[in-house]
Amino acid sequence: LKEIQVPDIQVVNSEKEIGRDWETQYRNWATPKGALALLVALQSQRKLSRESQTLLLKLMTESIPGAKRLKGELPAGTVVAHKTGTGGIRNGITSATNDIGIITLPDGRHIILAVYINDSLSDGSTREHVIADIAKAVCTRWTTGQLPDVSEYQSGVPGKITK
């Protein structure tokens, strides 16, 4: 990651190790800035062969998990190369529901987006809907210039998302 100039990402433990202990999952981390830098490196083919870039983008575009996240509220046919992340649940708190991706707009421009929801009390459907709404709002802003209304979301209980 340092070689391709991607800051703010640390990978220490395997998925198997993470599954054994709740606290271990927090040793692997990526800030939104780091995730975006990684996607920029992928998009710009930094230190990556054309074949590897093509394969990674194909796998990310055809990914089935997370269809209700970044892709969820976008127009049918919108190309989204993305990678989800989902953490464990303990005492009703989900440690992470994330999606990062490269969204291709109808005019060929790209939006690189990272949405992280962490330590949430909200159910999975709500968390995924929030990610989808954020992606839709960003795409609406970039394609129409209009700021979408997001006033329906409230913050009353820490970790709980309500509409």
Give each language-model segment a name.
Residues 36-79, 84-163:
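Structured C-terminal helix/loop/strand segments within mature extracytoplasmic catalytic/sensor domains
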Residues 1-47:
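Mid-domain, small-residue-enriched loop/turn segments at the edges of structured enzyme/sensor domains
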